[in-house]
Amino acid sequence: MGEKMAEEERFPNTTHEGFNVTLHTTLVVTTKLVLPTPGKPILPVQTGEQAQQEEQSSGMTIFFSLLVLAICIILVHLLIRYRLHFLPESVAVVSLGILMGAVIKIIEFKKLANWKEEEMFRPNMFFLLLLPPIIFESGYSLHKGNFFQNIGSITLFAVFGTAISAFVVGGGIYFLGQADVISKLNMTDSFAFGSLISAVDPVATIAIFNALHVDPVLNMLVFGESILNDAVSIVLTNTAEGLTRKNMSDVSGWQTFLQALDYFLKMFFGSAALGTLTGLISALVLKHIDLRKTPSLEFGMMIIFAYLPYGLAEGISLSGIMAILFSGIVMSHYTHHNLSPVTQILMQQTLRTVAFLCETCVFAFLGLSIFSFPHKFEISFVIWCIVLVLFGRAVNIFPLSYLLNFFRDHKITPKMMFIMWFSGLRGAIPYALSLHLDLEPMEKRQLIGTTTIVIVLFTILLLGGSTMPLIRLMDIEDAKAHRRNKKDVNLSKTEKMGNTVESEHLSELTEEEYEAHYIRRQDLKGFVWLDAKYLNPFFTRRLTQEDLHHGRIQMKTLTNKWYEEVRQGPSGSEDDEQELL
């Protein structure tokens, strides 16, 4: 009846005007009484030509991104193929992005095409799609033994060191602005910039230490600090943005500091607790629900639990990055050992592949941004920021290293301190955070974005590119070791990751073997002893002999199937078979 009335209202009969006017008026009143007021649509629906244009634009954006990734993969392959190990992949990919940006600019200048929208980097895409796999993989591939044994030192570098660097850079920018040396920024904006620019890129850092063959504990200190540093930097930046959104005009500096500290502690520990809890729940679920005979379901459950803490944390105003980092560490330490061998390998390789694609995409678009980003370049601001970034890194590394040496058996030498300071490269996270800042006016936002791009490119291209000369300059070993190091140095992350499967992730210990190997050891202390005695047995499944037999059969079947396919391939030959064997 309501639909009929609406039809009468929309299409009045023009032949019987008098009757229909009365009927129309009555029906309009009735319609208004019966039909509810329509609410706003949940999502804006675009139809017709506008929807078609948006679909075409999205398709071109996807095509352009995939094309950039494909070219970058070929570039990385050429680096590995021709053994250009002295050149970090991030440097090569950023350089390629700059070259592609220049070509696109020439094409646009000649009016042959317009790819402005496709080459622009969207910060929301970075934080929702690209950053979570990078952070989760870094936590998942962590060597937990050394990490938990050095958790105190790692936390000191990651939390206090990053905070020191943020305060040095932010405070320096604020006071230089007040002295009219550079453009003025208020205190919260200065601290936000200092926080985002304090995030270091761990890839080149770890390549340096692997090349120097340093102590694995020291390697873990730097790697753990680099991983936690990203999450801490993001939380500090969110803290500064939260203070910006509040009215802080009537609040003293001490009260502002206390509010910032309270916000940071809630974000840090709340997000870490949420990620840890999610990881422990995933371990219990996959311990008591045996999905090992259906690897596709098992792998699907792992992917769900991997992204789950990020969405939940962001939904309740916590840090999704911090949550997904701790979830990755916990899932790797407990959940991973409840998986079948096939899913263990599949999970490692999938995470590495996705993280590589995400990192490559960000570095490529970083190079493209030189020509696509609306810049506001101020030479004095850029120079002072570079000086403050280097000084803030020094104030972070040297005092904390000397402090740690009082409590450590493995001392951090001055040579190592210098290399740690030199290897504080900035990468994808500062760039994306700078685009995500909500600063007014627009000129201030462009100034921060341009300065961040310059600092990132300066550290990646200049510091990253001079990594190999520095290693050779500071290599003071004997001649044989010096010659060996020249051959062994390899800054290709992809080649190293592709050549190995983490052995600690493929543990096949029965209940008796686990007890003999871990629980009866007398040298375990603190959290390591607690974990081996109570936590690990509670959250992980101890394998029976039948489980081990089934896992080995599964792996053998898959290996034989793959080998048969290789032998039957069109390019198979006896020489190839001998090489495989």
Curated annotation (Swiss-Prot):
What chemistry does it catalyse, as a reaction equation? Na(+)(in) + H(+)(out) = Na(+)(out) + H(+)(in)
Q: Name one GO biological process term.
A: acrosome assembly
Instruction: List where the protein spans the membrane.
Output: 60-80, 84-104, 123-143, 156-176, 191-211, 264-284, 311-331, 354-374, 379-399, 417-437, 451-471
Query: Mutating residue 225 to Q: effect?
Result: Induces endosomal clustering
How would you describe this protein's topology in the membrane? Multi-pass membrane protein
Tissue expression, per UniProt? Ubiquitous. Strongly expressed in skeletal muscle and kidney. Detected throughout the entire gastrointestinal tract, with high expression detected in stomach, duodenum and ascending colon.
Residues where Phosphothreonine occurs?
510
Q: Quick one: a GO cellular component term?
A: acrosomal vesicle
Alphabetically ordered keywords of this record = Antiport, Cell membrane, Cytoplasmic vesicle, Differentiation, Endosome, Golgi apparatus, Ion transport, Membrane, Phosphoprotein, Sodium, Sodium transport, Spermatogenesis, Transmembrane, Transmembrane helix, Transport
Annotated Gene3D superfamilies: 6.10.140.1330
Q: Which of the residues bear the PTM Phosphoserine?
A: 571, 573
Which superkingdom heads the taxonomic lineage of this protein's source? Eukaryota
Cellular compartments annotated:
Golgi apparatus membrane; Golgi apparatus, trans-Golgi network membrane; Endosome, Multivesicular body membrane; Apical cell membrane
Known regulation of activity: HOE642 inhibits SLC9A8 activity.
Where it mainly occurs, coarsely classed, is Golgi
Alphabetized GO MF terms: potassium:proton antiporter activity; sodium:proton antiporter activity
One Pfam annotation reads: Na_H_Exchanger
Question: Of which family is this protein a member?
Answer: Belongs to the monovalent cation:proton antiporter 1 (CPA1) transporter (TC 2.A.36) family.
Q: What function does this protein fulfil?
A: Na(+)/H(+) antiporter. Mediates the electoneutral exchange of intracellular H(+) ions for extracellular Na(+) in 1:1 stoichiometry. Acts as an Na(+)/H(+) exchanger in the trans-Golgi. Contributes to the regulation of pH regulation of Golgi apparatus, and consequently, in protein trafficking and endosomal morphology. In germ cells, plays a crucial role in acrosome biogenesis and sperm development, probably by playing a role in the fusion of the Golgi-derived vesicles that form the acrosomal cap. Can also be active at the cell surface of specialized cells.
Q: What is this protein called?
A: Sodium/hydrogen exchanger 8
Taxonomic source organism = Homo sapiens (Human)
